[in-house]
Amino acid sequence: MNFRDKAIILKKRNIKENLAIVTVLTQSYGIYSGIIKDLHSKKNTIIYQIGNIVDFCWSARLDEHLGTINCELVKSYSYLIMSNKRNLLYTHSLIELTLMSFKERELHANLFEKWLENLESINTGNINVKNYINFELLILKEAGYRLNLDRCGVTNCTQNLIYVSPKSGQAISATVGEPYKHKLLLLPKFLVHNNCEPEDIYEIQAAFNLTAYFFNKYILIKKKLPITRELLLKSILEYSF
């Protein structure tokens, strides 16, 4: 068995002096892992870095085997990721959530395209809170837990959406939600309107709380959110506004 595809390097784990297991997100086959040999060669040291886009080749005698991989570098983002603390936390938090949320060998084409989009945002210096939270919302959606934030789940109206139901994941308008607001999650304005950015640190905190609630409820269960996510939020709150 073998195939070739475009892929993004997500993880590398050394298992012997010159061997490692590398995990990638492929465009057409989902998350895949395999063994790389000659780990410390000059070429492989450059290729197998987190965030790099590669031409990925996987081969194994049987499909259920771990297999071996061979890659050629297509585009490197590793320097941009490693040279900036915010970029590093941003990327590693999303990698960990991706690996926690999806099984290997499940196709998620939208997820791959979102990863490409965000790597290019890092390249152009355009990463921000809105991009990050929208990525988390996409992960939830691809995992089968879409939040419906564009209209009220009770009245179907699209105005004054300021809450989210923790049960249904649907937006709730101010009028409908007022009697139950102590039981509802806050919905930041910038997640409803495309032309809005976070107004203050409270909106940022509310956005992180919103997605965290549904990750904990549906995906992580007894696992914990990545520590890199916590550090990213701390970094954002310290240096924003």
From Swiss-Prot:
One Gene Ontology cellular component annotation held by this UniProt entry: bacterial nucleoid
Name of the protein in its database record: DNA repair protein RecO
GO BP, sorted A to Z: DNA recombination; double-strand break repair
Keywords, in A-Z order: DNA damage, DNA recombination, DNA repair
Family per record: Belongs to the RecO family.
Functional summary from the UniProt entry: Involved in DNA repair and RecF pathway recombination.
Coiled-coil regions listed in the entry: none
Record carries keyword DNA damage: yes
HAMAP family: RecO
InterPro entries noted in UniProt: ARFGAP/RecO, DNA_rep/recomb_RecO_N, NA-bd_OB-fold, RecO, RecO_C
The keyword Transport appears for this protein: no
